[in-house]
Regions:
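Alpha-helical transmembrane segments of multi-pass membrane transport proteins
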Residues: 1-422
Length: 422
């Protein structure tokens, strides 16, 4: 039966059926073949979205869009540039640091790439940085958007695995920081090798002015994450606070949004949220079909049998599958499908589910910068006008750096579990 459900899923994908429909139709095939009453389908679809934690998903998506289009990201980037732009290759370092900071607000890789790319790519080109390298760096740094909290994929994983969203968020800090540091070191190496120029030297007064201008945006991560970890509000409530705060700043402080642009922004975010929530709902039906035939348990049994219950080999097999899945599937849909499949194997080798949730998120995030799907490369390509192939070559070493961090946190779980307190 596993061959039927996965075969149907990949067949629908190959003929161009959207991912959400492919998941739902594959599950429907199993329902029909097994003679399960079809009344179960709408009930299971409803259950898929019937979780308070999922309220965070559309709110974080909207907050990311407001951040990118409300003038907040531009001012954060300008402040970072005033601090570091004076050193050789400083603007490329700013690209990564800005991505890390904006990741702490948006919760989305594509939103992070769009926000930083729109602000910095034109200036990088003007300063004689190679456009393909700059686009690749920002696209790869955008993957940090779903690792440093808040993170939409981590919210989805928490709902499926029954884990704490706050602990997953804490677990993402160190891996996200390591990803950023790796990319910064690569950017410094390339800047010296290609003799990229130093930027403008700002006076202390100018730096202070940039800081004051960006302060409202700089306060946002502290309000969101501080509120979550201090227990003032839940992650779902934090998402609503993020939207309210970014809207107030964008409309009344920076005056970068009017009603017309706000309407378009809300509609666009609503469409994106609807697609994500539809994928979540159909994945619940898909997961029900898998559980009905005990396919996750069968896969776990096969993995444990092949590896002799060796945790190192089990994690290695899972890591490779995660990286491949991330190359061909959107992050949220891949996470929703893979989580129930791999959890029995992780439990079987005594793995920590918070650790695995962060590992899964990082692995799938790398797929955002790995063709053929590579949504972050698409975003960078749209901003620069470069074809994807031009960005793919310089992004390869950056993806390898991210993969090194991925395997490091897999086999050194303390890097993930230190802050959650395990």
């Amino acid at each position: 039966m596993g061959y039927l459900i996965f075969g149907a899923f990949f067949l629908f994908l190959l003929i161009g059926v959207p991912i959400g429909l492919s998941i739902g139709l594959a599950a429907l095939v199993v329902f029909l073949q097994a003679g399960i009453p079809l009344q179960m389908v709408p009930q299971t679809l409803f259950e898929g979205n019937n979780s308070f934690s999922l309220v965070a998903v559309p709110f974080f998506i909207l907050a990311g869009d407001v951040l990118a289009r409300g003038g907040i990201s531009e001012r954060i980037v300008a402040f970072a540039e005033s601090c570091l732009g004076r050193i050789r290759g400083g603007l490329s370092i700013v690209s990564v640091l800005a991505s890390m900071f904006i990741a702490a607000i948006s919760g989305s890789g594509a939103a992070t790439t769009a926000a930083v790319g729109a602000s910095l790519l034109p200036e990088l080109e003007e300063r004689k940085y190679d456009v393909d390298f700059s686009a690749a760096l920002i696209a790869s740094a955008g993957t940090i958007g779903v690792v440093i909290p808040p993170s939409v994929p981590m919210v989805l994983y928490a709902v499926i695995a029954g884990e704490s969203v706050a602990k997953l968020f804490l677990g993402g800090f160190i891996p996200g920081t390591l990803m950023g540091l790796g990319l910064i070191l690569w950017a410094i190496y390339i800047a010296k090798k290609r003799n990229y120029p130093a930027g403008k030297k700002y006076s202390a007064k100018e730096v202070w002015h940039k800081f004051v201008t960006a302060l409202w945006g700089l306060m946002c991560p502290g309000i969101i994450l501080g509120g979550i970890f201090s227990g003032i509000f839940t992650p779902s409530e934090a998402a609503a606070v993020a939207v309210l705060y970014t809207l107030l700043v964008a409309i009344f402080v920076y005056k970068a949004l009017d009603f017309k642009h706000f309407y378009k922004l809300v509609v666009g975010s609503g469409v994106t949220s609807a697609l994500v929530m539809f994928i979540i709902a159909t994945s619940k039906v898909f997961g029900w079909g898998l559980a009905f035939y005990q396919i996750p348990q069968a896969i776990a049994g096969a993995m444990l049998s092949v590896t002799g219950n060796d945790a190192f080999l089990v994690y290695l097999m899972i890591d490779v599958i995660i990286l491949i899945a991330g190359m061909f599937m959107e992050t949220a849909s891949a996470l929703i499908i893979l989580t129930p499949i791999f959890l029995p194997a992780i439990i079987g080798v005594g793995g920590n589910l918070v650790h695995f949730g962060v590992v899964l998120t990082v692995g799938l995030a790398i797929g955002m910068a790995t063709p053929p799907v590579a949504i972050n490369i698409y975003v960078a390509s749209a901003i620069t006008g470069l074809p994807m192939g031009k960005i793919t070559k310089p992004i390869i070493p950056m993806v390898l750096i991210l993969c090194a961090v991925f395997f490091l946190i897999t086999y050194v779980p303390g890097l993930v579990l230190l802050l959650p307190g395990y």
